Structures are given as structure tokens and as C-alpha cells.
Regions:
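Active-site beta->alpha loop and helix N-cap motifs at the rims of alpha/beta catalytic domains
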Residues: 1-70
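Catalytic alpha/beta core domains of metabolic enzymes, predominantly
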Residues: 49-57, 64-124
């Protein structure tokens, strides 16, 4: 999974196109941490052109509030984002809110993949 995240939307779009050109299996991006989106709509609006830059690859939202400072509803993002990003397949969920993670797993009968990214709470 190629990470294409950037505070610059145009740069992220270019990286997404490159990921598709080199036949990555998928791509992911974190929310911008400089000009932070303040709503799910803002987050969807930021990611839509990025996801559309590599329409043939699965796209994951890399949710990591501890690094980005963006803490918006991931289930709401997945539902709203799917409307404009057909290649949105899930999230890398790097947060300790297991209730929200469970909501993501159950959305639309398990439509979305949820990659667990918070290693500190995994048992060995």
C-alpha cells in the first residue's frame, strides 16, 4: 500500500497517479495536518480529487489523529466518502477508540476493510 499523503493536495494527487503507474496494490493517505479539515465534508472534499487520481486502485483513509490532529467521525467519512470515491475501500484505523473501529467494521454489512494500526493495544 503506497502512502501518498501530503499537506499539498496537488502533490498527493501526483503521488496517487504514480502509485497507479507503478502498479501498487493500493494507496492510502492521512488527513492534512497544517490546514486541518474541520468537518467530514471538508475531509471528503480534500480526499476526493486524490482518490480520483488513481481510480483503478483501492484507496484507504489513514486515520491517525495523534499525528494529524484531525479527529472526525471515521464511519461518517466512509459513508460520505464512498459517494464521491468509488475506490474508497476502507481505513487504516490508528486510534484507541475501539467502539468507533467496530462501527467501521459493521458499516453496510462489512463493506469496508479496517486495517488495525494501533499496535500498542494488540496482544502478543
Amino acid at each position: 500500500i503506497a502512502h501518498v499523503g501530503s499537506n499539498c493536495q496537488l502533490e498527493a494527487m501526483e503521488l496517487a497517479r504514480h502509485a497507479q503507474e507503478v502498479e501498487a496494490d493500493a494507496f492510502a493517505a492521512m488527513a492534512p495536518c497544517f490546514f486541518k479539515p474541520s468537518s467530514v465534508k471538508d475531509l471528503v472534499d480534500f480526499f476526493t480529487p486524490i482518490a480520483q487520481s488513481a481510480p483503478d486502485l483501492p484507496f484507504y483513509y489513514y486515520n491517525m489523529p495523534s499525528m494529524t490532529g484531525v479527529s472526525l467521525s471515521v464511519p461518517s467519512f466512509l459513508i460520505e466518502g464512498k459517494k464521491t470515491m468509488p475506490n474508497l475501500v476502507g481505513t487504516k484505523f490508528t486510534h484507541n477508540n475501539l467502539m468507533e473501529m467496530g462501527e467501521c467494521l459493521e458499516l453496510n454489512n462489512g463493506e469496508f476493510e479496517v486495517l488495525h494500526g494501533y499496535d500498542e493495544i494488540l496482544h502478543y
